[in-house]
Amino acid sequence: MAVTTRLTWLHEKILQNHFGGKRLSLLYKGSVHGFRNGVLLDRCCNQGPTLTVIYSEDHIIGAYAEESYQEGKYASIILFALQDTKISEWKLGLCTPETLFCCDVTKYNSPTNFQIDGRNRKVIMDLKTMENLGLAQNCTISIQDYEVFRCEDSLDERKIKGVIELRKSLLSALRTYEPYGSLVQQIRILLLGPIGAGKSSFFNSVRSVFQGHVTHQALVGTNTTGISEKYRTYSIRDGKDGKYLPFILCDSLGLSEKEGGLCRDDIFYILNGNIRDRYQFNPMESIKLNHHDYIDSPSLKDRIHCVAFVFDASSIQYFSSQMIVKIKRIRRELVNAGVVHVALLTHVDSMDLITKGDLIEIERCEPVRSKLEEVQRKLGFALSDISVVSNYSSEWELDPVKDVLILSALRRMLWAADDFLEDLPFEQIGNLREEIINCAQGKK
């Protein structure tokens, strides 16, 4: 049976971030391996930097060793106390592991201001140490349990290699993707969501990955009315002079609960393929049928094959009841129209305590999982239909971890679009295939 830590996710993240963003790997647990400090040192010496966490009835305290414990050798020790979400620290200074853990106080000089006595299940501190750590003035703390962790890099060489391989695999899959039944050459994905959610940034991020450097073709910003005021359909080249990829990302004016956002009627003109690229939206009224950017008889290739609702992960909790009602109403109308849709959570890297290491297994991350459940609860999306990304915003260089999230989300959208194409009425598919065959024969 695997040995697990007593730390909550939140407390573990606070400690990780406080001590250099390291990943904590459990080496020793008193309640499992025994409260014998000699055994502790046998397991924990020569392991690199370590973090000892002590649990009492009222406190979580401990010691961080910046260097590896070695028998008889001094290491720099930092003491800490964790209370709720606040952490305080005090530098104990140089100390041998034997004296810190009360293993042989006769052979080495014993510090009188802090000792961990596993055999008697207590921590001994002087008043000054208690005061520096912000603890109540009680010189002895009973130990319920204690754990020692090895502090490792959150992204070791093995993990980085795995991320790079996954990125390579995703790029290959997206480059060679073919829409279901060859009914269209390019899938059209509409990015829809509140103003400032990150729709244009997601397009820029996708383009950046395929261009091999960070790009900003679509303007982004934080205006309350949004930056995107035109309908844009973006084809993306594979590299600077490469062929166009088999998908088009469509950007639009953001949704607003008040005046200034995208008209609901315009959404369905977009879905049906009636609106041309670069149409200037009018927030007060939808497109007129006699407008020069209105397409009278759009074909399947002009239609939207998947809608991706884009939400800022840090803003979901602040959605007004009007915004929630608007999104739910649009979703119902999409379902009635047979249009598949997914959700995209952006800005997850700006959430509290999220580290780069968390982005590798982002959906296992507790705060992100909580956000996914919030989207499910408030807006009705299935958890399996929600992707998580970290867009490029201020970075100068590409990051393979971010790339994997972006490419995975895009692949999920293409899978959803295939579902839409496969679900088209049989008669419509038959007519389309006949048109495709006739067109191909006419080119010969």
UniProtKB/Swiss-Prot annotation:
Keyword RNA-binding appears in the UniProt entry: no
Domain TLDc: 1-152
Entry-linked SUPFAM superfamilies: P-loop containing nucleoside triphosphate hydrolases
Compartment(s) where it occurs, according to its Swiss-Prot or TrEMBL record: Cytoplasm
Leader sequence residues: none
Coiled-coil ranges (or none): none
UniProt protein name: Interferon-induced protein 44
